[in-house]
Structures are given as structure tokens and as C-alpha cells.
Amino acid sequence: MITLIELFAGIGTQYQAFKNNYEVKCIGISEIDPRPLKAYKALFGEPNNFGDITKIKELPKSDVWTYSFPCTDLSIAGKQEGFEGKHSSLIYEVYRLLCVSPKPKVLIMENVANICNTKFMPQFQDWIDTLTELGYTSTWQKIKANVYGGATIRERVYMISILNTDIKYNFPPAIHQDKVLQDFLEPVKNEYYIDEYYGPTPSITKNFFNSVKLCDYKNGGQGNRIYSPYGMGVTLTATGGGKAGSSGGLYYRENKIYKLSPIEMCKVMGWSKEQAQIICSALTPREVGFCMGNAIDLTVLTKIVKGIKEQNIL
């Protein structure tokens, strides 16, 4: 059995991805937001929560640490303060803990695609170099969720770092996607109906590579664009900005405009219907949108962890 510590644990996607591949024991997490913690407890029971990462003195021995630190200062929607911003600078707490704790064999990071843009790539490279000095060999890749079988075009950077080896992790090749958003949806419910649809007649030809925008709704801003369910889903966001589509976007269904239900938001992020029901029983619909918008795509991370197992890294 391998052991896992989840820093910035969220709802526990990292733990579930390992459970999907290994016999694993999560020996502790660090999470201070009560919203994802409610979902975590509902899914896995009461965790050993170390609490605020800035107050952790050291961590116990573990095979794996995950540290998908806050993207707030890296995101396009944020203030673009980078690794020195109030929230994203918490990555340096991971460095501090690596210096005073038994080092894990594997480190896993996920963050927004913006982390490797022209502005932030020097800071990201500095972090990779820091891990190298600590004995880690790192490999990173920018991945859209649908490339690994996910329901959306959510694009994120993933990095695997391995201790005391020259062997690099090889990210799995893209799969042949055979599903579109429609395949993840539940039967239509009127409570998620927004308005009548007067846009162009959508094609039912499936697009496995991208979302298919049909037209704008109202001002056409984020959350006010209508998409075909026969393409890939758009990226879920933690805040809908009060727009009609909230966290999950708007979709044409049965000649009307609908938003995703809380159950559907969980499913398009890789959770089973049974798990989605557990999450939704613990959270309000708004909290589900917040947590799924902040979450890691479970389908993608399960595939990445499977690669760790197949390459005999753990």
C-alpha cells in the first residue's frame, strides 16, 4: 500500500485518482476552505487535516505529496501577480516543508495553463530548478481534459517530479475520444431551464476535439454563450459572475437553453453519478459550482496516475 498527503486537497480528486489505480492510504491533507472539506468528508470520511499549510511544522513520511496550489494569482481572471501573489506564493510553503520533512518519492502538481505562458514561465522554471536542487526530476505537460477522455476542453498544466532518479515520467498518449458532452448529461429537468432558444439550428454531428458555440445569450460574456451538447463541454469556472450559465456554461437541449445541473457538473469533471450524488448531498448548488470550478479533472488525473503505476515509479 502506498501513502499519500494532499496539500491544497480540495474535494479529494488526487486521493480518488490514486484509489482508482492503487491500494492507497491518505495519511493527511491540508485544506482550510469549508466548502470542499464538506465534500471531502462526504466522499471519504473525516480526514486527518493538518490545516493551514503556513502553520504546519513538518509532514510525516509519505510516498506521494500532491500540491496543486492556488491559481488565483496566475489565472487569466486574476490579478496576474504570479508566484509572488498572496495566494499562489503558498507554493513556497511546499518548499519549506520539503526541506524539513522526509521527502516523498513522487510530487504531483496541477495548475492553470497560464503558469507556462511568457509572463510566468520564468517563475515556473525557477520552481522546477528548485525541485532539481532538492533531488527531483520533473516532467510537465499542458493537457486538455478531452485528450484523456474527459468531457470538457479544460486545459491545465500537470507536473510529475520523481526523487533521486534520472528517469522522467512519460505522459500517456492521447486516447481516441468517443464521447461528447451529451454522453455525460442527465435527462432534462425544467429547474435548469433558462430561456427559449432562437439561435441557429445546431448540427448533431459530433465534435470530439472542441466545444461548439452556437450563439451568444444576452451580452455574450463569460457564462452567456450557448453551446451544442454534441461538442465538448466548456471549462467549468469557480465563479459564474452572476451570469445565466453560472459555473458550467449554457447548452442547447430540446429547443431550449439549459445550464448544467450540480450532478452534471460533477459528472463532467470525472465523478460517477453515485459520487456526484454524494457531493451534491453535502453542498448547496452554488458550492458545487465553486468546488467543481476549482477541482482537478478526475478522468485526467486518473490517467496520469495510471501512467505512474505502469512505469513502475511507485
Regions found by a protein language model. Give the residues of each.
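Short connector loops/turns at beta-strand edges and beta->alpha or beta->beta junctions
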Residues: 70-72, 273-274
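Short, well-ordered alpha-helices that flank and scaffold nucleotide-derived cofactor binding pockets
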Residues: 16-20, 42, 96-99, 129, ...
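C-terminal target-recognition/interaction regions appended to catalytic cores
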Residues: 199-314
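SAM cofactor-binding core of SAM-dependent methyltransferases
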Residues: 2-55
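Class I S-adenosyl-L-methionine
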Residues: 55-64, 71-235, 239-242, 255-258
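Short, glycine/charged-enriched secondary-structure capping and boundary segments
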Residues: 19-23, 42-45, 78-83, 121-124, ...
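Gly/Ser/Thr-rich beta-alpha loop segments that engage phosphate groups in nucleotides
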Residues: 12-14, 70, 80, 151, ...
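Local beta-strand N-terminus motif with an aromatic residue
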Residues: 1, 25-26, 62, 104
